[in-house]
Amino acid sequence: MKMIVGLGNIGKEYDKTRHNTGFMVVDELAKKHDINNFKVQSDALIADFRVNGEKVLLVKPTTYMNDSGRAVRPLMDYYDVDLNDMIVAYDDMDMPVGKIRLRQKGSAGGHNGIKSIIAHVGTQSFNRVRVGIDHPTKESVVDYVLGKFRKEQITDFEIGVQNAVAALEDWTTIENFSQLMNKYN
């Protein structure tokens, strides 16, 4: 089984905000596979589909961003998901809007959702797909990440989401993560 985790904050007030990038990636992947009914389990919204007979679990933690690990770890345990079979999609302020980057490990880079997952899984070594949201120029970091994309950013962001979805779909079938990084980075 593979597990794709999209990070974000639950609630209408956070819809389409930069910090909900992971949710938007998972939602787009779900849409592509005609999935529209997530259910609640272990502080998360989950759904699944199959690729070549293997189950792929989509996860959107409902714990709010800063406590995402509290939802992720119990699902990994319940479904017996190995760290190599999990990937996390999330926003990255240190990359231009829409740019994606895949990594197998690394620090949280100041991202509280990733900090929480690292704390709950006990390692920095897990797969990630980061989608650039750019860095604020005038507003505070909190206001920026909890704000919506500016009109001139939307097209680049949507391309980034589509590229992240393509990378995640490839991830479900490619054994060698380095090949995937070479293709998308």
Swiss-Prot record:
Location of the active site: H19
Keywords: Cytoplasm, Hydrolase, RNA-binding, tRNA-binding
GO-annotated molecular function: peptidyl-tRNA hydrolase activity; tRNA binding
A GO cellular component entry from the record: cytoplasm
Localization, UniProt: Cytoplasm
Keyword flag Repressor: no
Enzyme Commission no: 3.1.1.29
Main subcellular localisation: cytoplasm
Name this protein carries in UniProt: Peptidyl-tRNA hydrolase
Species whose genome carries this gene: Pediococcus pentosaceus (strain ATCC 25745 / CCUG 21536 / LMG 10740 / 183-1w)
Classification lineage: Bacteria, Bacillati, Bacillota, Bacilli, Lactobacillales
